[in-house]
Regions:
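Domain-level signal for soluble alpha/beta catalytic cores
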Residues: 1-194
Length: 194
């Protein structure tokens, strides 16, 4: 399901007095959808590229500080939409977009991770195989994953025509296991839609 933040990125506000008011309204509406999904016994996966991709796509005119303030608000609204849902039923996917561009303006994981970790979710899926973000397993040396969360690093690159050798995939997961408890790791792909 789309997060309130990503909806606001792809369907810009043209009605409400402020972006914050728009996000609040989206949060209230999406809370209904999220509850219906989990009430049906399904796992809720939230797509949240607004917390990474939107930095260089939509909010490039903002200073980094102002973007991070915006990201805080997006997490606040997301959490408001999730208040009645057990976090163990929620996955959140963060990405910088799976297009084949240079990604030279991507915001680093170390800058957004402290904000992302405030989300009331259990499972966090991140891109980590593409060449621009493959090194970011190291971020978890300094920013510890809370004990109540499970990281799903993308260990398969969804933007390449190459099929990775099984040892490459295993080594990517092993890198993460050096900085995160193995019980808190689950292999995934770089794309939340894969």
């Amino acid at each position: 399901a789309a997060s309130p933040g990503v909806i606001s990125v792809f369907l810009p506000n043209k009605f409400y007095a402020s972006e914050d008011e728009y996000l609040d309204k989206l949060s209230n509406l999406m809370a209904i959808e999220y509850k219906e999904i989990t009430n049906a016994g399904l796992q809720l996966q939230l797509d949240c590229p607004d917390l990474a991709l939107a930095r260089h796509m939509t909010f490039k005119e903002l200073s980094e500080k102002d973007f991070l303030i915006r990201a805080e608000k997006q997490i606040e609204c997301l959490n408001a939409a999730l208040t009645k849902i057990d976090s163990s039923k929620i996955r959140m996917h963060i990405c910088w977009g799976n297009y084949e561009g240079p990604h030279t303006f991507d915001i680093g994981l170390e800058k957004i991770l402290p904000i992302i970790l405030k989300a009331n979710i259990k499972y966090l899926s991140i891109e980590s195989s593409n060449p621009r973000h493959a090194h970011e397993w190291q971020v978890f040396e300094n920013i510890k994953l809370p004990k109540n969360k499970i990281l799903i690093p993308g260990v398969i690159d969804s933007t390449s025509n190459f099929v990775e050798h099984p040892d490459v995939v295993a080594n990517r997961l092993i890198q993460f296991s050096k900085v995160i408890n193995k019980e808190q790791l689950m292999a995934g792909t770089d794309c939340g839609f894969s």
